[in-house]
Amino acid sequence: MMTLYSGTTCPFSQRCRIVLFEKGMDFQIIDVDLFNKPEDLAVMNPYNRTPVLVERDLILYESNIINEYVDDRFPHPQLMPAAPVMRARARLFLFRFENELFSNIDAIDSGTQKQADKARLAVRDNLTQIAPVFVKQKYMLGEEFSMLDVAIAPLLWRLDFYGIQLPKQAAPLMKYAERLFSRPAFIEALTASEKVLRK
C-alpha cells in the first residue's frame, strides 16, 4: 500500500492527495505538522519537505514526480495525456506553473512586505493571462480533467489566504476554480486546516 506523508496545509501535498482520491485506490495518509516535522522526514527527503510517497522500497518526493508515478502505476482515470507530444506539452505547463506561479509562494509566506506584494502581483497577472482559456473549455487541456488542473487547484484554493485579488476579466478562471472545488476527489482531499483557508 502507498503511504503519503502530507503536510496538512502544504499545497504540494494537497496535489498528491487529490490524485490519490481521483484514482480511488487504497492508500494511507500520514499527516505531518509542518512546524514540528518528524525526524524520519529528513531521512526520506533530503530537503525535509512534504509530500513524500513511500511504496515498499520506493521513496519519492516532489509533488509532480509523485503524481506522475501514481498516474503511471494506476492508469485509470488517466491524468497525463497518452500521446507523447501532448504529454511533453503538459510537462512544460507544469514547469511553467512552478516557475511563474508557485515560485512566488515563499515570498508571499515569508518575504518582506515589498517582496510579498511583488509576488502577489506576479501571481495575479499570470492567472489573469490564463483566464481566457476557460471561456471555451472546461479544463486546462480541454474537456477532460488532467494533471494540470491538479497542479493549479491548491493555489486557486488559497487566493484569499495569500491576499491575491483577481480582476473582473479573470471571471472565467474563477468559474473554472469552482468546477475544480466541486469535484468529489478535491473535497475528500481537503484537510481540516485547508478548509479554513478559503472564505
Language model region names:
Residues 56, 153, 192:
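Conserved residues at the C-terminal ends of beta-strands
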Residues 85, 97-189:
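GST-like fold's C-terminal all-alpha helical module
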Residues 194-199:
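Carbohydrate-binding/catalytic loop surfaces
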Residues 1-131:
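GST-like domain detector, emphasizing the conserved glutathione-binding G-site
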Residues 30, 63, 169, 190-191:
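Residue-level detector of family-conserved "landmark" positions at structurally sensitive sites
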